[in-house]
């Protein structure tokens, strides 16, 4: 994870443990998640690695008829946090020019993060609803209606009260400075320091509620939503062949144990397993070329979502033909692309290396074993590791594995052996588990 993700996930966990407060993943996007901003949720998302929202560059006010502006969001309280995070080695941190970056990421003992929560007042929303209708001819609304998208309104945010620089000396093991990792974009040494400055007014986490459109220009934002609710009335969407992905896990259902994650991943791998041997091999080749190119993976994800929206066959060079002939297969691939794009580019490159060295089964077993024992563990701790989990690995393979899981927050120490469990890293470990499961399946017969 990047340092910014470490900050936002830990903050969301402390303010709203296992709740509906969504941590912001990218510092560069914080201005697009202010109150009243309209966002989209990824169709094939899962709460295991977070309901994933993407900005739209529009606010609710932009798509309403002209009229009076609502009152400013109200302040719901201030909070201060000290010693909130533990820095971890990471690859290059991708942040906007306005953010000062030194090294790669963490929190110093002297740093204090002061935040406030801002929310849209119920009276302000009620007055806005009475006074301003939807602009029915707005191009953005027309496009979203045509695609059958669900829109969400940011209703509450947690933002910084002042600029703060978070820093701490890196905890890199010696292995991270070996030349072996240079091509993977990993850096760090025992004494390496890292820091990032987060600007005042930066949104760190947010809550959303679904926008509902009734008829041509009526709208509402209900307090409670379920997975059957859609922003636009179903009867108004053209084309009956559209394929809309809806999962029970998309709407606030919290998962109780590792078994639920395992079953979810197995359901998706079963769809991939139905592909022909040639199709699976082709898919593995395509993914091997894309891993480490996060932007290209994200572009493929968006294109595939678009293909599902259109409801007809499309041609995608990155995917084998029999994937595109099956909506269920496309659905499953979209699920795994969501998991892989959660991982850093460095981790994606490590996955390719692991694939080449045929050690994916060992890595999958390691992640599965630790999550099975600690999935509900809500406190940090050091736990013994079964020696046989790593005994089959050579030195280079062991280093590779330590780096791969370490970048998801699972620190493995050979002495013992043992590992450090941090509950804040659970979403990233879930994504890594899904990614390993897919690649292991695809590589079995290759």
From Swiss-Prot:
Gene Ontology biological process terms, A to Z: programmed cell death
Keywords from the named record: Cell membrane, Cytoplasm, Lipoprotein, Membrane, Necrosis, Palmitate, Transmembrane, Transmembrane beta strand
Matches recorded under Pfam families: Gasdermin (PF04598), Gasdermin_C (PF17708)
Transmembrane segments: 78-95, 99-120, 164-180, 184-198
Keyword flag Thylakoid: no
Highest taxon of the lineage: Eukaryota
Region (Triggers pyroptosis): 1-252
PTM entry text: Cleavage by bacterial SpeB relieves autoinhibition by releasing the N-terminal moiety (Gasdermin-A, N-terminal) that initiates pyroptosis.
Residues reported to bind a cardiolipin: 9-13
Membrane listed as a keyword: yes
Record's GO cellular component terms: cytoplasm; cytosol; perinuclear region of cytoplasm; plasma membrane
Site location ((Microbial infection) Cleavage): 247-248
Distribution of this protein across tissues and organs: Expressed predominantly in the gastrointestinal (GI) tract and in the skin at a lower level. In the GI tract, the expression is highly restricted to the esophagus and forestomach.
Disruption phenotype: Mice are highly susceptible to subcutaneous group A Streptococcus (GAS) infection in an animal model. Mice lacking Gsdma, Gsdma2 and Gsdma3 are highly susceptible to subcutaneous group A Streptococcus (GAS) infection in an animal model.
Stated family: Belongs to the gasdermin family.
Domain notes: Intramolecular interactions between N- and C-terminal domains are important for autoinhibition in the absence of activation signal. The intrinsic pyroptosis-inducing activity is carried by the N-terminal domain.
Name of the protein described by the UniProt record: Gasdermin-A
Organism expressing this protein natively: Mus musculus
């Amino acid at each position: 994870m990047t340092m910014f993700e470490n900050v936002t996930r830990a903050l969301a966990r402390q303010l709203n443990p296992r709740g509906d407060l969504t941590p912001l993943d990218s510092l560069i996007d914080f201005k697009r998640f202010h109150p009243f901003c309209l966002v989209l949720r990824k169709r094939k998302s899962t709460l295991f690695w977070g309901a994933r929202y993407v900005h739209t560059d529009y606010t609710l006010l932009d798509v309403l008829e002209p009229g009076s502006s609502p009152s400013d969001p109200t302040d719901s309280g201030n909070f201060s946090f000290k010693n909130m995070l533990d820095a971890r080695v990471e690859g290059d941190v991708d942040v906007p020019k306005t953010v000062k970056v030194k090294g790669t990421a963490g929190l110093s003992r002297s740093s204090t993060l002061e935040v406030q929560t801002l929310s849209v007042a119920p009276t302000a929303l009620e007055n806005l609803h009475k006074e301003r209708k939807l602009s029915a001819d707005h191009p953005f609304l027309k496009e979203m209606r045509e695609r059958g998208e669900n829109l969400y309104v940011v209703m509450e945010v947690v933002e910084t009260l002042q600029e703060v620089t978070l820093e701490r000396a890196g905890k890199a093991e010696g292995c991270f400075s070996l030349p072996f990792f240079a091509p993977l974009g990993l850096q760090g040494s025992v004494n390496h320091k890292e820091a990032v400055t987060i600007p005042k007014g930066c949104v760190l986490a947010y809550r959303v509620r679904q926008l509902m459109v009734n008829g041509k220009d009526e709208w509402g934002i209900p307090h409670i939503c379920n997975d059957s609710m859609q922003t636009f009335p179903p009867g108004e969407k053209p084309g009956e062949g559209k394929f809309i992905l809806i999962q029970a896990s998309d709407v606030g259902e919290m998962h109780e144990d590792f078994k639920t994650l395992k079953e979810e991943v197995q359901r998706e791998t079963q769809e991939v397993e139905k592909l022909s041997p040639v199709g699976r091999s082709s898919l593995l080749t395509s993914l091997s070329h894309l891993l480490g190119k996060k932007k290209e993976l994200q572009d493929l994800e968006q294109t595939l979502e678009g293909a599902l929206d259109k409801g007809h066959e499309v041609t995608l060079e990155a995917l084998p033909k029999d994937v595109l002939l099956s909506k269920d297969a496309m659905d499953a691939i979209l699920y795994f692309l969501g998991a892989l794009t959660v991982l850093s580019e460095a981790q994606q490159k490590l996955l390719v290396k692991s694939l080449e060295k045929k050690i994916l089964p060992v890595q999958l077993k390691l992640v599965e074993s630790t999550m099975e024992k600690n999935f509900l563990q809500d406190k940090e701790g050091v736990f013994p590791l079964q020696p046989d989990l790593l005994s089959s690995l050579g030195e280079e393979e062991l280093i590779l594995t330590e780096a791969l899981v370490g970048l998801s927050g699972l620190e493995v120490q050979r002495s013992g052996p043992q590992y450090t469990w941090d509950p804040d890293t659970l979403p990233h470990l879930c994504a890594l588990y899904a990614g390993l499961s897919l690649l292991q399946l695809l590589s079995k017969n290759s």
